[in-house]
Every structure is written in C-alpha cells, then in structure tokens.
C-alpha cells in the first residue's frame, strides 16, 4: 500500500473533500486561498504551490484549483498532469444556479450528483482521486410543465452520459388547478458508461507487456428507467414526495424501487431531510449503479502477479440470486452551525452489501474552531466492518483553530485513492493513499457588491 505523508509549512488551500455543506460563497462574495509548502512523497521532499480563488455573483459561480508539485530535482510531478483532463481540472467549476433550481448548469468537478430519485445514479462523484481529477458537465432545466436533467462525466476520456426527461402531464389538462395531483410527474431516464473498462467481466494481466488483456467484454453499460413521482406536500413548512421507479440494465437484469423523499423546515432555524426506499432487485441488477464510488468500482487490478481484478460489470454478471433491500438517509442543519447527513443501505440476504455515507461539519462563522469529517464505505460485511479503513473506504477529517478570523491552523487527514497505470499510462485501477496535512491557511473573503 502506497503511503503519502504531507507536511505543509505554510499552506493556504483547502482539500478536495466532496462536502455538500457550504459549497459556494454567497452571491456577491468570494474568497481567495493560495500558498506554498513542502510535501513528503515516499520519503522525498516535494514542493507544492496552490492557488484556489472562488467567487459567486448573482446566480453564477466560478472556482479554480491550480496545484503544482515539484520533485527534489525541480521537475513537475508527473501525476499532476498525466491526462488532458488534468489541465482542464484547473477549472474546479463554473456554475449557474444550484441543484433543484429552475436552471442549474455546472462545468468541472461533479460532486454527489443525482439523476431523478437516485435509483440509477445517486451521489455520483467523477473525481475520487487527487491525482486523477476530471472535468464534466451537468445541465438541469425545469420549464414548469416539463424539464430534463443531464450529465457528461468527463471531457478527457469516454465516460458516463446520463439524461432524464420528465413531464407533468396534468398541467396540460383542466386538472392543472387541482392541488397535489396536478403535480404528478412522469420521467424517462437513460444512463450509460462508455469507458473502455466499463464492461470487462473476464481477463488476465500480462506481466511481460505490463497490460491487462480482457477476454470477455460486454462493452458499454446502459440503463433505462421509468419513474413516477407525486409531491403530496409542498410548502415552506415541508415538502414530501412519493415515487416509484422501474429500471432495466440492458443485457442484464431489472429492478424497481418505491419510497418517500421529505424535507422539513418547521421552525426556520432547523432544517431536516429524509429518504426511505424499499428496493426490489431482480437477477443481475444493482440499484443506484452509478454511485459515489463508481469510478473506483468500475475496474481495478487487485494483484498484478496473479492477474486478479475486480469490476462492477463482473459483479453485475455474477448476481444470479435476486435480493431485495432497504435504503435510508437523514440530514439535519441546525442554526447554520451544525450540518450532518448520513445514509445506509443493505440487501436482505447478501452479507457484504452494506454501503455507508456520513459527513458532518461544525464551522460557525464567528466561532474560533472548525470541525469537518466525511466517510464513505462500500461492501460492508457486518457492524465490525463499518469503520475499518481499506480499499473500500474514503475518509476526510479536519480539526482546526482560528487564532484570527481569516486564519485557520488545522490538521487534515485523508484516506483516498491514487491511480495505478499500465505501460501505456492507462489507468487500470486505484490503490488506497494516505494524506496527512498539518495546515496553516488563510481565507480572504471579499465582496464586490455596492454597500
């Protein structure tokens, strides 16, 4: 297992933490972070320079993320710019609007993106590695009577394409004025992965050529789905939607799900969200196939000497016994001081089917401290397996103190992934990577609106 230890003397940038909390500056405001430091990689000192400005104005937002790491000889670390997408990833994001706004467009890193009710794509992340950041595009537009959601995961290589179109058919009838039932929504979804490794189910690693040679390849993985949703409560106090989805993975199996999504704002200063879903899975079917770990799960070499590998397509092909399951999620935001969200899913009869996601943040604007944490784990076997760190885990923690309002002294720990490449520099998998960062950083907020 490769270990990467980082000590930053004066470093002024924040990590890629995939947090959903406080993602962007408020409209008319921005912040500039940047700095330089020393990084130890495999016992050798490397030198890091980083610039990360971010600004929001009206519905627009822009964030950049330039990170340069040089080895002791002054050469740029090759992992920093292996692919064309590495150059594009300097643009962390350009966006218009926010998710669930009438118009939402985002170009860049895609963190936790969901199509529809999430039974095909849920919390998908296109950049799970510091050394393999990607740039993609999402476009969601709601015209009132109809609309669509879409995603293109990466401009640097073939990847995931997804599109969900939906219509509110009763808006075209005399029932338009009837509360509740008039907002009935029907949707149709297509999502496919066109990456060259998406459909590999059998093969072997050639140690002479240092390349993986597939013997069975199903090609692209394509999923189509139909869904119906009904908002039974809609207002400032609460929003509650009932839904039913049916999905088919082409050349594999099918499944369905029914559930409820709710958001509550009863007192104004406490907000809560919840989701509960019952899943009915047929043979050769995986719900929420494109999840937050999909870029890791898609394909990876686990042992070059034996040629063993794992792929999601191989897992899909091997699921011969249907197994139903549950998914639950709960989130709370209290006074803007405490944010926490957690979710867990498991199949009824499959022992290693648990998937856990937790993230939390305590970062009051006026308080002298910062606490952040995020944790994801897949293929959980039992309760003892929940919090063991391995190649099925992602962890981010930050504990910080603010001696001044613009200065944070913190310790950051990341258990993430680094890409493994073959002789032709193609990514053939990922391996766990540890990053420890004692950090001093400065955040300079600014405003460009008139007083």
PLM regions and their residue ranges:
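Sec-dependent N-terminal signal peptides
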Residues: 4-14
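Sec/Tat signal peptide C-region and signal peptidase I cleavage site
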Residues: 15-19
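Short glycine/proline- and aromatic-enriched beta-strand/turn motifs that initiate or cap beta-hairpins
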Residues: 20-54
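Signature for the C-terminal beta-barrel architecture of outer-membrane proteins
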Residues: 21, 27, 31, 44, ...
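Surface-exposed loop and membrane-interface regions of Gram-negative outer-membrane beta-barrel proteins
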Residues: 62-93, 120
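Gram-negative (and chloroplast) outer-membrane scaffold detector with strong preference
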Residues: 89-104
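Outer-membrane beta-barrel "beta-signal"
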Residues: 94, 165, 430-451
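Conserved C-terminal beta-signal and adjacent last beta-strands/turns
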Residues: 369-372, 394-410, 443
């Amino acid at each position: 297992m490769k270990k990467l230890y980082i000590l930053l003397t004066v470093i002024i940038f924040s990590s890629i933490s995939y947090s959903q909390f406080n993602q962007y500056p408020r409209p008319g405001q921005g912040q500039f972070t940047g700095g330089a430091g020393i990084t130890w990689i495999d016992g050798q000192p490397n030198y890091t320079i980083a610039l990360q400005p971010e600004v929001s104005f009206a519905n627009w937002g822009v964030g950049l993320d330039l990170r340069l790491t040089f080895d002791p000889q002054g050469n740029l670390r090759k992992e920093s710019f292996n692919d064309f997408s590495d150059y594009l990833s300097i643009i962390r994001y350009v966006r218009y609007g926010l998710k669930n706004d009438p118009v939402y467009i985002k170009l860049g890193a895609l963190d936790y993106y969901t199509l529809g009710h999430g039974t095909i794509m849920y919390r998908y992340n296109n950049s799970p590695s510091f050394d393999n950041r990607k740039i993609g595009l999402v476009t969601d537009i709601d015209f009132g009577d109809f609309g669509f959601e879409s995603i293109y995961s990466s401009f640097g290589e073939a990847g995931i394409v997804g599109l969900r179109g939906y219509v509110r058919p009763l808006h075209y009838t005399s029932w338009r004025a009837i509360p509740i039932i008039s907002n009935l929504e029907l949707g149709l979804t297509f999502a496919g992965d066109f990456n060259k490794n998406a459909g590999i189910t059998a093969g072997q690693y050639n140690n002479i050529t240092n390349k993986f040679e597939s013997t069975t390849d199903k090609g692209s993985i394509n999923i189509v789905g139909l869904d119906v949703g009904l908002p039974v409560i809609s207002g400032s106090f609460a929003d509650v939607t009932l839904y039913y989805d049916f999905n088919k993975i082409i050349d594999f199996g099918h499944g369905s799900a029914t559930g409820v999504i709710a958001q509550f704002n009863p007192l104004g200063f406490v907000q809560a969200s919840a989701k509960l879903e019952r899943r009915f899975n047929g043979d050769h079917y995986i719900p929420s196939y494109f999840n937050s770990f999909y870029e890791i799960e898609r394909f990876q070499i686990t042992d070059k000497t034996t040629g063993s590998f794992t792929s999601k397509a191989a897992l899909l092909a091997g699921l011969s016994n249907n197994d139903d399951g549950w998914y639950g999620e709960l989130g709370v935001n209290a006074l803007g001081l405490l944010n926490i969200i957690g979710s867990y899913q498991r199949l009824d009869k499959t022992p290693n089917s648990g998937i856990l996601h937790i993230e939390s943040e305590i970062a009051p604007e006026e308080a002298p401290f910062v606490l952040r944490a995020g944790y994801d784990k897949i293929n959980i076997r039992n309760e003892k397996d929940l919090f063991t760190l391995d190649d099925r885990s992602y962890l981010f923690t930050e504990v910080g103190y603010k001696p001044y309002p613009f200065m944070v002294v913190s310790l950051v720990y990341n258990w993430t992934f680094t890409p493994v490449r073959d002789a032709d520099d193609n990514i053939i998998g990922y391996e766990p990577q540890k990053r420890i960062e004692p950090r001093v950083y400065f955040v300079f907020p600014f405003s460009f609106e008139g007083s």
